[in-house]
């Protein structure tokens, strides 16, 4: 099996949310409460609190839409920074993704976008088959659980981030 260590990226995005938010409240939209999603939420909260100890995360579930509580947190004036989808949206759709800030005019400004680089897994697995290091022994589980150091995931930060902030996040 293979999967990226999503908690590494969400921890750093939680830190960035704490640094860039003007309030102690930030939002988080999670897909559904399965697999690594609760761990990613926890990592985001821990990242937030590492730079803003009084910080609080308001959680909303994308799988349970509620018109009274929109996923862009437009009903909460105390939340200007929130984390939403972790996929790239089609060019020109202006949908929220990654870590965003809602500007006073309602436009969403991207701050940081996680990128899951699945091809890293595929290249290394195929390479190990070709160089003879891959072992297909029966009854033996092989797991690939790689993080940022492996290149399986990264964060694309928006231009204009403070140099001190970037030094902290790297």
What do the predicted segments below correspond to?
Residues 1-2, 28, 102-107:
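Glycine/charged-rich beta-loop-alpha catalytic/anionic-binding loops adjacent to active sites
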Residues 2-24, 116-134:
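Hydrophobic alpha-helical segments within soluble ligand-binding/sensing domains
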Residues 9, 13, 37-40, 44, ...:
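Stable alpha-helical elements in mature extracytoplasmic
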Residues 10-55, 141-160:
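An alpha-beta-alpha
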Residues 32-36, 63-66, 87-91:
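Solvent-exposed loop/turn segments at secondary-structure junctions
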Residues 52-64:
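Short beta-strand elements in bilobed, periplasmic/extracellular small-molecule ligand-binding domains
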Residues 62-75:
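Structural motif
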Residues 77-170:
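A post-motif C-terminal structural segment
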């Amino acid at each position: 099996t293979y999967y990226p260590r999503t908690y590494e990226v969400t921890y750093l995005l939680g830190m960035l949310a704490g640094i860039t938010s003007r309030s102690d409240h930030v939002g988080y939209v999670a897909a559904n409460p399965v697999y690594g999603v609760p761990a990613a939420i926890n990592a985001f909260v821990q990242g937030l609190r590492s730079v803003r100890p009084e910080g609080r995360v308001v959680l909303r579930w994308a799988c349970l839409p509620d018109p009274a509580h929109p996923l862009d947190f437009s009903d909460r004036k105390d939340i200007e920074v929130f984390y939403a989808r972790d996929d790239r949206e089609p060019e020109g759709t202006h949908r929220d993704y990654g870590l965003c800030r809602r500007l006073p005019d309602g436009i969403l400004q991207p701050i940081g976008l996680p990128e899951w680089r699945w091809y890293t897994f595929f290249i290394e697995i195929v390479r190990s088959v070709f160089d003879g290091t891959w072992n297909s022994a029966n009854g033996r589980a092989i797991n690939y659980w790689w993080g940022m150091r492996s290149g399986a995931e990264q964060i694309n930060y928006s231009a204009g981030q403070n140099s001190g902030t970037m030094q902290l996040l790297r």
